[in-house]
Amino acid sequence: MKLSILFLFAIAVQAAFLGIDYGQQSIKAMVVSPKAMMEIVLTPEAKRKDTSGICIRNVNGVLERHYGNSIGSLVTRFPQNTAMHLRSLLGKSMNDKDTIESYLRENPGANLTSTTRNTIAITIDGVEYPVEQLVAMNLQEIIDRANQHIKETDTTGIDFVEQVGIAIPEQFNQAQRQALLDALALTSVKDEAVLVSDGLSVAIDYALKRPDLEINVPQYYIVFDVGTSAAKATLFSLTQPEDLSSPIKIEIGAFDSEATVGGSKFIAAIADIVEDKFLEKNTKITRKSLVENPRARAKIIQAAEKAKLVLSANNEAIISIESLVDDIDFRTTIARSEFQDIFEDNKHTVVKAIKGAIGNQLWDDNISLEDISGVILSGGSSRVPMVQEEIAKLVGEEKILKNVNADETVINGATLKGLKYFGSFKTKPLDITERSLFDYSVEMSGESSSKTVFEKGTKFPNESSILYKAPKKFGKELKFDLFESDTRILSNIVDTTVSSKNWTSACKKGQLYLNVTFDLDSNRVFKIKDITVLCDSDGNAKEEEFEFIDVINDVTKATDVMPLSNAEIRQLSNAITSWNRKDRERKRVQESLNVLEAELYDCRSFIEEFEEKLGEEEFETLKSFTAFVKEKLEYLEDNSADMSKKDIEKLVRETRSQRDTLSRFYNSLDAALGSKDFQKLVDTASKSIKKYKEIESKNLADLENKAEKFNVIGLNVTEKYNSILSKMSFSSIRRSSEENIKTLAGLIDEVNESIKSKAIDDESLENLIKTKLAFEELINTLDLENRQWTYQHQLVMKELKKMYNKKMKAIKKQEKQNENEENGDDEGDDEDETKTKKYLKEATSSGDSSTIKEEDSTGSNEAGNKGDEEDEEEEEDDSSAGNVFDDEL
């Protein structure tokens, strides 16, 4: 799919959008930013989807959190620390027995408990984690990966995820939707999130890939999504208006689901087969002991998941489980026919959701299966041959549309719907109609029955109002119970103890009314938008003529399954932020540790290569380095967990330094090391020393040439030169050079003596290489320092020139002021003027009156008479070097 089909242009904002397909078993994400247009967020292993869940372990007092594919190896070892398939627990309570039983079967070792809000939490190592918090951690890890991806593509660093859209099952009720929104509120994304149904997501993705739609003729399709939790069917229509620039119309007409069909049920069936075969071979093991062993059950379920994938493409799958129970390794083979036999009597339920969608339509079209243009498959388990066979029987093989990427169609569509909702990016226009799956009603305290606000099939988002006649006598409170179908989802409680008296007083002779406005928002969350108190003063007025009295804002909400309060959101969010910070610190330490380990193992390989080339020769340097590497590797094995990032980086630098030294030895093994070769080194070293002395003499001569001029204006050029060197941190180079010359001179004497006595011919290879390397290092260092000193001398001389010219300018200015003074000045002033004139005359008696001639690095004079204007520009230069001396002038 070309991006040009989807995007017209990006609006000039810096908010990135993240679409998430939050599945029960796996997660996929797609990021959209000005520099990353609809790109899948890859896992750390560069895969396009990740495992849904988290593993939390307390290791030596440190909380470690693991995500994604790493959970696969941890769930079989630490099932009690692993929380997977969390989506099924959102918005549920411990009273949902079927949900709890199914979850514990799929997740052996999980310790479920109830929160004070009547929701579910998972206890891990004695700590209670609300499901919303666990989901938030999972989502935050994806958000962090998306932000890292953006950072790699956008170097400005100002673009990051601020908006999120999440694909969810259409049948999610309000408690489940609110729980997911609460989980998002715990992440770093603070903007409102948009929830997109799976079926609509597929419909959007499919619509934008269909250029051949008939004009003004609705085409009907069914999205059949066989995911982990259930088989779901979404009926929708596509219509292309005659004006091709007008938006394509996408209308949702029906939905149904079947919980007895889905990936988890298929996996459970295969797990039962594995369990039966194991018990048949190992008769001493009881089924009870096997079922009650969390690790064994986790291993069986993991093997069943892999077998399901294999059986979708092959007639049989090999199961191999190490140390299943009591160190017993188990290996068996499962045939596809064995798996299908389990569902033989209930195969018809596979397509039950499709029949349900056709039989319970929410629109007026009322189509039949024959009117369907095609069935779009989605979800990983739609690949199961039995599923496709049953669909083909129902609608015909030709109507199964297989040109859709079943794995990514949901994330594509959910991302586009989210972009349309937020408007951050301009996309191809779509006219989308969604309908509610439930009735939404309200019951006010004192009323005998509830009133329907939004009927099943109502288009949303939507608003509606109900006008209630207020009771003659108010009690302490008014309560409005909101219902989704027959389930109470929210109680809005209004304290009327004080306010009702004010209302009655304002409407003494009339009738009070309460106008309650309800909202079914874009996330299909039903709530009261506002309550307005009105007065019909004469009892006969029309509603639009009622007198406004008050708006009720102070509403307390309560329900059986409570959402997170603002205080709980802050508390749980702060905890996640703290863990995230510690994770980042631990990650940085681990990355440094990985670098150190790689360095040490690389050094060990290098040592082996060195020894092979060295043959029978022995080097103390090599022995020392070998001992160093061995010691550090042993230290890491026992103490790596206690090392700080600073300690690790220090050891990395030390390792690299020693490795570099040994590398120079290695590269010198084949070098020429005779008397003539060392004589060449001696000659080169002598030239470097001579060069230093020449530079020193030349620099001193430069200062002597300027000494007289500086003395005339009252400055000591040598003192100023040394002061500038010190303030520019240049003096340390001279000290280093002097020390290196002293060392190099000693080495020259030592080698000359060795050559003269021919003792050099008897030196060991290691000592010869040491001497050669010492020569080379000292010569290279001194040559570098010579170049640095020459350059620094030029800079200092330039600063001295600025200093001199500023001083001369000040003298000229003073002379001009004295000349302009009136003749009535006292004798002392005349004497000062005479001194100034004499001072200036002496300073300018030879050469140019406003500049000092500069000399190049070879000692030749360079004309410095570019004019007073250029000198004044240099004097006014606001560079940091020049400003150092302002206080001295």
UniProtKB/Swiss-Prot annotation:
Compartment(s): Endoplasmic reticulum lumen
PROSITE patterns named in the record: HSP70_3 (PS01036)
Keyword Membrane in record: no
Ranges of compositional bias, category Acidic residues: 820-833, 868-889
Transmembrane segments: none
Motif residue range(s): Prevents secretion from ER: 886-889
Catalytic function, reaction form: ATP + H2O = ADP + phosphate + H(+)
UniProt GO BP: endoplasmic reticulum unfolded protein response; post-translational protein targeting to membrane, translocation
Region span, Disordered: 811-889
Disulfide-bonded cysteines: none
Any one cellular-component term (Gene Ontology): endoplasmic reticulum lumen
Range of residues in the leader sequence: 1-15
Pfam families: HSP70
Coiled coil (residue ranges): none
InterPro entries: ATPase_NBD, Heat_shock_70_CS, HSP70_peptide-bd_sf, Hsp_70_fam
MF terms (GO), sorted A to Z: adenyl-nucleotide exchange factor activity; ATP binding; ATP hydrolysis activity; ATP-dependent protein folding chaperone; unfolded protein binding
UniProt family annotation: Belongs to the heat shock protein 70 family.
Protein name: Heat shock protein 70 homolog LHS1
Species of origin: Candida glabrata (strain ATCC 2001 / BCRC 20586 / JCM 3761 / NBRC 0622 / NRRL Y-65 / CBS 138) (Yeast)
